[in-house]
Amino acid sequence: FYLVMILDVYSRKIVGWEVFHAESAHHASLVIRRAVLAEGLIDQPLVLHADNGSPFKGATLLETLHALNITPSYSRPRVSNDNAFSEALFRTCKYVPGYPVNGFDSLQAAQRWVQDFVLWYNTEHRHRAIRFVTPAERHRGEDRAILAQRHALNQAAREAHPERWSGKTRN
């Protein structure tokens, strides 16, 4: 089975995904088109960064990107950190508790598992790179209020018990 996921780099939210029997530019195009529509980003200037795999360089996908005003960007050969966000996401996916180490019995089982993973990742997973808010909170713009509230709570605790604090608080 082949998983296509679209990640918003700013918020780390998975904005599109699908599991297919085969890898193809047509399948990648479907996921991108759905994500753009679901996020309300028609005619917005976007950039899609992908590896150099054939599904993301095929004519079908390039036509879709052009039609949606999306600029393609590709990883450079032999530059390991060009696709770091995607690599980190897939690592999280494969190492989350409950990942079936022996694979999936069916396409439907894979789709159900990924659906549950995406829901967890977007709405429950407190992401270290975005200061321990969820990707959905950051995507909706709620992170600033959450971080301000967290900071105020830490400041109040510090003022109430300064002996418990030896330095600055982390994010």
Q: What do the PLM-derived regions correspond to, one by one?
A:
Residues 1-171:
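Charged DNA-binding/catalytic regions of mobile-element recombinases
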